[in-house]
A protein has these predicted regions:
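Conserved short acidic donor-positioning loop in nucleotide-sugar-dependent glycosyltransferases
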Residues: 15, 27, 42-43, 69
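Short, acidic, metal-binding catalytic loop of nucleotide-sugar glycosyltransferases
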Residues: 25-34
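A conserved acidic beta->alpha catalytic loop
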Residues: 26, 41-50, 91-94
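Glycine-rich, basic loop-to-helix element that forms the pyrophosphate-binding segment
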Residues: 66-82, 103
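Short aromatic/hydrophobic "clamp" motif used to bind/position activated sugar donors
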Residues: 87
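Active-site donor/metal-binding and catalytic loop motifs
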Residues: 123, 220-221, 230, 245-270, ...
Length: 347
């Protein structure tokens, strides 16, 4: 019997067979081979099962099929089936760098339990005419690979094949990768507070399950993913928030890199996000979380929110009634703000 793997890579998927094929190919050449892939097919109706089947003899992979129940359910199912003591959360559209597993493992050699946030870049793997991609990014890619110009047409075009990922991963990344918008958005915060995010009150806002690792027992201890958070957004922030409150440190790794494949996005994303934000407000009634959500509505800068959170924590630790009064006022204000948005949403 094969030894139990020490790392489980959690990948939920739903109707993303073409992207998943490239993602799985990137795990064939990992420098660290002591891992398994745990894929939960969340009710796909495309070729997902066939894609996974082609990798069964090439890499250790377990695939669980279930009716479509959403991201949180799918990840919880994967956690229940995982054998590794360390979980790496990734997505079906993330091409892993060759040292991806090894770099995540290295970050967990510290004595204290931690959440490790890997580094994210983007990659153009499949061209679609309606892709939301900056013109400057296209110009940069064409400068590196001029023959792309003839491939960016009015039809869907595969620019990267599984064979290219398997056999020429580094060259493929060099030709087709570009900065990831989310990573660019949070880069200033990481630069200011360092890789350990010392003095930053909202480290959990940076944790997305496209590239995050954490000991499996910690995830189980805090209750895994909240299945009441439905649709898109904030289920990963919610898990990281609970891990943070339970005492887990947060560490950013610049070297545990994966590459987010550009793809089309559905129209209901912000509708889902707002509904999930409202659930978190009602679930926690916590000043730090509500301050962060105010920044997302453009009502406060992150610097201002961080300063207020630090001051509030100091007052609360001293037992000040001002802290309690502020918490009540903040909760009522933010709850009303997001409830108003919900009432204006169609449907």
């Amino acid at each position: 019997m094969a030894a139990r793997p020490s790392i489980s890579v959690i990948i939920p998927t739903f109707n993303r067979a073409r992207y998943l094929d490239l993602t799985l190919a990137s795990y064939l050449g990992q420098s660290d081979r002591d891992f398994e892939l745990v894929i939960v097919d969340d009710g796909s109706t495309d070729d997902t099962a066939d894609v996974v089947a082609t990798y069964r003899d090439q890499v250790r992979v377990a695939c669980v099929h279930q009716a479509n129940r959403g991201r949180s359910h799918a990840r919880n199912t994967a956690i229940e089936h995982a054998q590794g003591d360390l979980l790496i959360f990734s997505d079906d559209d993330r091409i892993a760098s060759r040292s991806f597993i090894a770099e995540h493992r290295a970050e967990h050699r510290a004595d204290t339990p931690r959440v490790v946030l890997g580094w994210q870049e983007a990659i153009l793997s499949i061209w679609m005419p309606d892709l939301m991609i900056a013109a400057g990014t296209i110009v940069e890619l064409l400068a590196r690979r001029p023959n792309l110009r003839g491939q960016l047409r009015d039809s869907v075009t595969a620019l990267i094949t599984p064979e290219m990922v398997r056999d020429e991963l580094d060259a493929t990344i060099a030709d087709f990768s570009c900065p990831e918008p989310w990573q660019q958005k949070i880069a200033e915060t990481i630069e200011r507070y360092g890789l350990d995010l010392n003095g930053y009150c909202f480290p959990w806002r940076l944790g997305v399950t496209g590239n995050l690792s954490v000991p499996r027992q910690l995830v189980r201890d805090v209750g895994m993913f909240d299945v009441e958070l439905r649709g898109w957004g904030l289920e990963d922030l919610d898990l990281h928030y609970r891990l943070h409150r339970a005492g887990a440190a947060t560490r950013v790794s610049r070297t545990a890199i994966n590459y987010h494949q550009f793809h089309e996005r559905g129209p209901a994303l912000m509708h889902d996000w707002n509904n999930n934000a409202l659930r978190l407000i009602e679930k926690y009634a916590a000043v730090d979380l509500e301050l962060y959500l105010r920044t997302m509505r453009g009502k406060l800068s992150l610097d201002e929110a961080n300063r207020i959170a630090l001051e509030h924590a100091t007052l609360a630790a001293a037992g000040s009634s001002v802290a309690a009064d502020y918490a009540r006022l903040m909760h009522d204000h933010v709850h009303a703000m997001f409830l108003l948005v919900k009432t204006k949403q169609p449907g």
